[in-house]
From Swiss-Prot:
Belongs to the Clp1 family. NOL9/GRC3 subfamily. The gene is nol-9. It is found in: Nucleus, Nucleolus. The keyword ATP-binding applies. It is an enzyme of class 2 (transferase). Pfam families: CLP1_P, NOL9_C. Its EC number is 2.7.1.-. Polynucleotide 5'-kinase involved in rRNA processing. GO terms for cellular component: nucleolus; nucleus. This is Polynucleotide 5'-hydroxyl-kinase nol-9. It comes from Caenorhabditis elegans. Its main location: nucleus. GO terms for molecular function: ATP binding; polynucleotide 5'-hydroxyl-kinase activity.
Length: 549
């Protein structure tokens, strides 16, 4: 890369890159970076020129196994370029090279970046469970360790130029509405695999770059959630650009989130009820001039189209952005198409890194599992799932706990603890409309509640994994990033459909230690009512586990 020059810094984990205007770079892998000088953007977010301080670094996450790179573009700078300020900043980070760099720059106005090789905790944890996740192994051999990212000059453009211009024009129109204090809504739409999630992130970054101070994401993609593990609808205020994948920016606890309890919509009425609650919440808590970007599902036909029709009626978006990659895929049929502002984008497909064999894209189920790993990574003592058994769990006393189970997963009272042991559970706020009963009718045992079509929507504050159950101590052990000590009352434990603890939690430990506590009743317990109430799960091999009841 003759136009991209690299220099070493005083800190061996940092590198300086000098990139000339007009360059367009693709970045695969993960790293942190900042812009010392120049006019540049990353994934449609305009980068500020800042000093080299730890708080100014922004994380990029563009795993090669997830196909689409981060796009770094450099433009002409204009009169705001400060050579003297750049020299001062370079002297701080590269005292041995700053004069050489400034001599090379001369009177030109390139963008100057500092890249950090250090992975953040969540990224390192996730990259350890999927081979060739960040970058291909053949690239790793070409890079001085640690090989976490790779910069190429592939001129990859996601959105064609004409459609890019249309999108910019529409964003400028919305910006005028913002200046008038009007709240606006943007609805990106796309079939499965079209790149809708990347489009949603791009729209967030564009809004932040266009002067929006109040950007909200209403995430209703229960199968591929952005800020929570799957199964939730949520409203999140975004204050910084989204430059990574969901596993890297999970929130520990949620302020405005409801647990739908599945990765696909089986009850449209409940789904739309939750959606309307969250959109009404946006209208109540958002500031004048705010924008709400809706992360819809990649489902545009049949029931998916019915849901999009409902979302359109509730929100009346000021802008629709439809993205598609495959002309043979069915597309959404808009209601009253002529009345809407619609930008259609036929997106380009990423070809990966030139010269390397194409890698199979990760399946949706694995992406969901990686999001769960990223969510719990903040509780790990080190960035490896093998350290999960060392995480100290919270203790919840039986009499204070309510367990909610979908009707399809209901078991006999004697098997309740076995059915939730090791499972991931949504932590929800108690709702007076729930109709719980005590296990065996005993006050010192948990309450059990069946979730069916008549159950209320439950507000979700986070997720936890049942670490174990002690019938003797009357305690359930839960591992969660949520600070349960700050709650006024214990959360309701809610199990979802098709939302399970990832298998990698069981196989990551080379010593094959079970990731849960094993407690059993003492033989000859005087209370025969509890006999057989709990039998521990048994880890039979590193790759298979079975349950004994």
């Amino acid at each position: 890369m003759e136009e991209v020059v690299r220099f070493e810094c005083r800190d061996s984990n940092l590198e300086i890159y000098v990139v000339q205007p007009g360059e367009r770079l693709s970045i695969f892998g993960s790293c942190s970076f900042l812009c010392l000088a120049g006019n540049a953007s990353i994934n449609d977010y305009n980068l500020p020129a800042v000093s080299c301080e730890s708080s100014n670094f922004m994380k990029i996450s563009a795993p090669q196994r997830m196909d689409v790179p981060a796009i770094l573009q450099v433009f002409k700078s204009g009169p705001s370029y400060k050579h003297a300020r750049l020299k001062f900043r370079l002297k701080e980070v590269a005292p041995k090279n700053y004069e050489k760099i400034m001599e090379m720059i001369g009177t030109t106005e390139p963008s100057v970046f500092i890249f950090s090789k250090i992975l953040d905790f969540a990224e390192e944890t996730v990259s350890g469970v999927v081979s060739n996740f960040l970058i291909h192994s053949s690239i790793q051999k070409q890079i001085i360790l640690p090989p976490h990212f790779f910069i190429s000059r592939d001129d990859f453009i996601i959105y064609p130029q004409q459609q890019e211009a249309q999108l910019k024009s529409q964003m400028n129109r919305l910006n005028k509405l913002r200046n008038d204090g009007q709240r606006t809504t943007i609805l990106p739409i796309g079939h499965k695999g079209a790149g809708k999630s990347n489009l949603m992130r791009s729209l967030v970054n564009r809004c932040l770059s266009n002067g929006y101070e109040h950007v909200y994401v209403l995430d209703c993609d229960i199968g591929q959630s952005e800020f929570t593990p799957c199964g939730c609808l949520s409203l999140t205020k975004v204050t910084s650009p989204i430059l990574g994948k969901p596993h890297g920016h999970q929130r520990a606890s949620f302020e405005n989130s409801f647990f739908y309890g599945d990765i696909t919509v089986r009850d449209i009425n409940l789904y739309m009820d939750i959606f309307e609650r969250l959109f009404n919440k946006f209208k109540v808590i958002s500031e004048p001039g705010s924008v709400c970007i809706i992360n819809s599902m990649g489902w545009v036909t049949d029931e998916g189209a019915e849901i999009l029709d409902g979302i359109t009626r509730v929100t009346d978006p000021e802008l629709f952005v439809e993205i598609f990659r495959d002309q043979t895929e069915a597309r959404y049929q808009f209601l009253n198409r002529a009345e809407h502002n619609i930008v259609e984008i036929f997106a380009n497909n990423s070809i990966g890194v030139i010269g390397l064999p194409p890698q199979k894209r990760l399946p949706a189920a694995l992406i969901r599992e990686l999001t769960i790993v990223g969510y719990f990574s903040s509780r790990l003592p080190r960035p490896s799932l093998a350290s999960f058994p060392k995480v100290a769990p919270y203790k919840l006393r039986f009499e204070n706990v309510t367990i909610c189970v979908p009707v399809d997963l209901l078991v006999e009272d004697s098997h309740v603890f076995s059915s939730i042991n090791t499972q991931i559970m949504a932590l929800c706020i108690n709702n007076t409309d729930l109709k719980p009963r005590k296990l065996y009718g005993k006050d010192d045992l948990p309450s059990i509640c069946v979730i069916d079509g008549n159950s209320p929507a439950l507000q979700c504050i986070g997720f936890g994994i049942i670490r174990g159950v002690s019938v003797e101590e009357r305690i359930i052990f839960v591992v969660t990033p949520v600070d349960l000590l700050k709650l006024e009352e214990p959360p309701v434990l809610v199990r979802g459909m098709r939302i399970q603890t990832p298998t990698m939690f069981y196989t990551a430990d080379p010593y094959n230690r079970c990731p849960y506590v094993l407690n059993d009743l003492e033989q000859g317990n005087s209370d025969n009512t509890l006999d057989g109430l709990y039998q521990p799960s048994v880890n039979t091999t590193q790759f298979k586990r079975s349950r004994r009841f």
